[in-house]
């Protein structure tokens, strides 16, 4: 059996000598609290300075949002000066948005899990809730340039190491790290790996239920953020975690390129630090 040496690194040595910081949380729930608290603290600090907050945010993982709602409503932290740019959305075959009422829609999902639950007097103003729009991809950069900053980009990491839907180059596709990091907000096909894990997580394994296309905020815009925060809460994140931290900088594992960012950190659960050495796993023993 050919085992990648990085998969043999003991869990307590992960992140050593990596330019990307690692914060290991005991459980998935602890991770969600830490992420929510950092988002809240960033907003609160800007509020106290009389400054606006602008973030690129995900739809997933969902866990931080319920905790952020609780923190905002309990401690009365205003989001009125926030601009949230969601990082991606699914598209139809004609590269238009899927219906907002589709269970898979991130636009509809953000309303259900976050915007509809924050107290009105504290909520992000409707005009400051953004998604990248097919045909108007340039507007994401315009929002960031108008704000003069991007406080944070945070979100989950895909099974192939992607961030948002910044998918790795396809086999045989030539792309340098510099070229990949210069890719802006755009429409693109969803990779087979992403379709597979997303249908496993959300559609009972029905591959055909996952759309073929998406729109994503690009790595070009992500790198403008003061802080990059990646969330890896699941056991299936274990392989990508090690590649990101110890596999070298490569577009084949997009998040590995955040080693070039001055403030990039991964929040992971302890289960994600386990070695991904192959074994036959028996579920529901």
Q: Language-model features: where?
A:
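ATP/nucleoside-binding phosphotransfer catalytic cores, i.e., glycine-rich phosphate-binding loops
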Residues: 2, 9, 19, 25-26, ...
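Ligand-binding beta-strand-loop-alpha-helix segment within the catalytic cores
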Residues: 4-23, 29-32, 77-154, 209
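Glycine-rich N-terminal segment of FAD-binding domains in flavoprotein oxidoreductases
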Residues: 44-76
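Nucleotide donor/acceptor-binding cores
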Residues: 51-53, 80-82, 226
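Gly/Ser/Thr-rich loops at beta-strand to alpha-helix junctions
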Residues: 55-64, 159-162, 235-237
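A glycine- and small-aliphatic-rich helix-loop capping segment at beta-alpha/alpha-beta transitions
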Residues: 68-78, 101-102, 168-177, 247
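A short secondary-structure junction signal
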Residues: 141-142, 163-177, 240-244, 278-279
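Class I SAM-dependent methyltransferase SAM-binding "motif I" and its flanking Rossmann-like core
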Residues: 164-211, 215
């Amino acid at each position: 059996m050919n085992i990648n040496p990085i998969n043999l690194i003991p869990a307590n040595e992960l992140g050593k000598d990596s330019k990307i910081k690692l914060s290991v949380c005991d459980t998935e729930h602890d991770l969600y609290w830490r992420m929510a608290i950092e988002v809240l603290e960033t907003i609160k600090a800007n509020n106290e300075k009389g400054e606006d907050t602008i973030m690129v945010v995900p739809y997933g993982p969902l866990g931080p949002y319920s905790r952020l709602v609780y923190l905002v409503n309990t401690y009365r932290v205003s989001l009125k000066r926030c601009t949230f740019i969601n990082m991606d959305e699914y598209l139809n075959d004609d590269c238009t948005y899927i219906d907002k009422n589709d269970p898979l829609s991130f636009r509809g999902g953000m309303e259900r899990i976050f915007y509809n639950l924050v107290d009105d007097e504290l909520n992000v103003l409707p005009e400051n809730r953004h998604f990248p729009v097919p045909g108007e991809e340039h507007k994401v950069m315009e929002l960031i340039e108008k704000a003069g900053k991007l406080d944070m980009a945070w979100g989950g990491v895909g099974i192939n190491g992607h961030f948002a839907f910044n998918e790795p180059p396809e086999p045989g596709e030539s792309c340098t790290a510099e070229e990949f990091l210069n890719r802006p907000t755009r429409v693109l096909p969803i990779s087979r790996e992403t379709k597979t894990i997303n249908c496993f997580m959300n559609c009972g394994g029905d591959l055909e239920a996952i759309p073929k296309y998406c729109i994503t905020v690009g790595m070009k815009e992500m790198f403008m953020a003061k802080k990059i925060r990646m969330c890896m809460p699941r056991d299936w994140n274990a392989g990508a975690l090690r590649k990101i931290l110890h596999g070298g900088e490569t577009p084949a594992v997009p998040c590995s390129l955040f080693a070039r960012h001055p403030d990039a950190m991964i929040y992971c659960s302890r289960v994600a630090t386990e070695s991904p050495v192959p074994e036959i796993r028996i579920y529901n023993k």
